[in-house]
């Protein structure tokens, strides 16, 4: 069996640790804990790292297509490895949740998130496992684009790091239990 854990974000130093890149931040943490490094794959348009856990190959994926085209990399990997949608877990930011909150879902619309919209368009379904990490709404008249592409202030950054630890725990629990519904019940409380 194989699992794809995909963190959404934008490639490049310019976007490092911005609000829109919390998916990349989580994937980076998982890679660090597993002591694996990423290599760029031009065919899949993604940075990939992998490890084995309980006999399953786990791919850590950071699409390099920029957020709005994330579905290209996800679809290419699912197709190449002949994986089911159940083998996919997407981790991404959510404007409509307060900073640091997490929510696990097994289906849903894009909710205005262009990376999720791209994935839905490319894989042809809204039914896939996902973990949303709250980044909050823009304040003081800031545009949504400026908000998601900005870095966290100090207090929010501390909260996001704590959230990433919780998401890390939930992902590891999911990989051990192999049941996303059970993981949702445990971590959505």
Swiss-Prot record:
InterPro entries: Pept_tRNA_hydro, Pept_tRNA_hydro_CS, Pept_tRNA_hydro_sf
GO molecular function: peptidyl-tRNA hydrolase activity; tRNA binding
GO biological process, one term: rescue of stalled ribosome
Keyword Cytoplasm: yes
Entries under Gene3D superfamilies matching the protein: Peptidyl-tRNA hydrolase
Protein name: Peptidyl-tRNA hydrolase
Amino-acid positions noted as binding tRNA in the UniProt annotation, renumbered to this chain: 15, 66, 68, 114
Residues under site feature: Stabilizes the basic form of H active site to accept a proton: 93
Protein location: Cytoplasm
Residues annotated as catalytic: 20
Catalytic activity: an N-acyl-L-alpha-aminoacyl-tRNA + H2O = an N-acyl-L-amino acid + a tRNA + H(+)
Annotated positions for site Discriminates between blocked and unblocked aminoacyl-tRNA: 10
Organism: Streptococcus pneumoniae serotype 2 (strain D39 / NCTC 7466)
Intrachain disulfide bonds: none
Family statement drawn from the similarity comment of this UniProt entry: Belongs to the PTH family.
Keyword field: Cytoplasm, Hydrolase, RNA-binding, tRNA-binding
Gene behind the chain: pth
Function: Hydrolyzes ribosome-free peptidyl-tRNAs (with 1 or more amino acids incorporated), which drop off the ribosome during protein synthesis, or as a result of ribosome stalling.
GO CC annotations, alphabetized: cytoplasm
Subunit structure: Monomer.
């Amino acid at each position: 069996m194989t699992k794809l854990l995909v963190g959404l974000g934008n490639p490049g130093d310019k976007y490092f640790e911005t609000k829109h890149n919390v998916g990349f931040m989580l994937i980076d943490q998982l890679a660090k804990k597993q002591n694996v490094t990423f290599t760029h794959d031009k065919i899949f348009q993604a940075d990939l790292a992998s490890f084995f856990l309980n006999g399953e190959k786990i791919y850590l994926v950071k699409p390099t297509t920029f957020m709005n085209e994330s579905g290209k990399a996800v679809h290419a990997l699912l197709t190449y490895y002949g994986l089911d949608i159940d083998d996919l877990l997407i981790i991404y930011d959510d404007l409509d949740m307060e900073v640091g909150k997490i929510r696990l879902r097994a289906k849903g619309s894009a909710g205005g998130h262009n990376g999720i919209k791209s994935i839905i368009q490319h894989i042809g379904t809204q039914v896939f496992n996902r973990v949303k990490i709250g980044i909050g709404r823009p304040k003081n008249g800031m545009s949504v684009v400026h908000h998601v592409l900005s870095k966290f202030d100090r207090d929010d950054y501390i909260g996001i790091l704590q959230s990433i630890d919780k998401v890390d725990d939930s992902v590891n629990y999911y990989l051990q239990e192999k049941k996303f519904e059970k993981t949702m019940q445990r971590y959505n409380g």
